[in-house]
């Protein structure tokens, strides 16, 4: 849906195929980082915040892989493999995980719902939140998303849209 208007302007004869999510996505609210379950991703929107959260997890829980768009493909792939192989139980990432990286995640927690877009700091729109939150649970495995740290709560209306995949 987020790209439909743009694609329609570029190409007239396009067929859209909508595939239903086969698993349930639920909102789990706020959790302290120390209480976040294994097989979780914590999403941040600056390298400084990603590294700070990863260090906190390392001290409290033993380690985390890091995925950011600024990493080289080789480094990013090795970090994904570190997580996927079970060497670490947590992933700290930017919104880069929302674009073509499928991982075995049960939970996604946002440390922030604002990002710098190259011009200004702005709130994520619902489709951006949904693209990232939907990394939790895949195929037939249910997943959940929530917030952590100082992140402001997601409104009940937004939660309903996200849980029902209307974004």
Language-model region placement:
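Short, charged, surface-exposed secondary-structure boundary motifs
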Residues: 23-30, 73-79, 118-124
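Post-DEXD/H (motif II) to motif III coupling segment of the RecA-like Helicase ATP-binding lobe
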Residues: 1-22
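Conserved segment of the helicase C-terminal RecA-like domain
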Residues: 2-3, 7, 86, 90, ...
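Conserved strand-helix element at the start of the C-terminal RecA-like helicase core
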Residues: 2-3, 34-60, 64-68
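Flexible beta-alpha connector loops of hexameric P-loop NTPases
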Residues: 41, 65-73, 115-123
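Conserved catalytic network of the ASCE P-loop NTPase/AAA+ motor domain
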Residues: 8, 32-36, 58-59, 82-85, ...
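Conserved helicase motor
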Residues: 20-24, 45-48, 65-78, 94-98
């Amino acid at each position: 849906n987020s790209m439909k208007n743009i694609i329609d302007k570029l190409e007239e004869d396009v067929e859209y195929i909508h595939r239903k999510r086969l698993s349930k996505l639920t909102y789990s609210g706020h959790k302290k980082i120390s209480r976040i379950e294994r097989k979780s991703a914590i999403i941040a929107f600056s390298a400084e915040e990603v590294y700070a959260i990863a260090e906190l997890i390392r001290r409290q829980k033993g380690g985390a892989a890091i995925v950011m768009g600024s990493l080289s493909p080789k480094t990013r792939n090795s970090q994904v493999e570190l997580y996927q192989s079970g060497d670490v139980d947590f992933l700290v990432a930017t919104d880069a995980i929302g674009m073509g990286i499928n991982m075995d995640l049960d939970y996604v927690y946002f440390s922030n719902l604002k990002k710098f877009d190259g011009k200004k700091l702005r709130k994520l729109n619902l489709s951006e939140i949904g693209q990232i939150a939907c990394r939790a649970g895949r195929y037939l495995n249910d997943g959940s998303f929530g917030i952590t740290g100082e992140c402001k709560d997601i409104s009940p209306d937004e939660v309903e849209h996200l849980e029902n995949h209307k974004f």
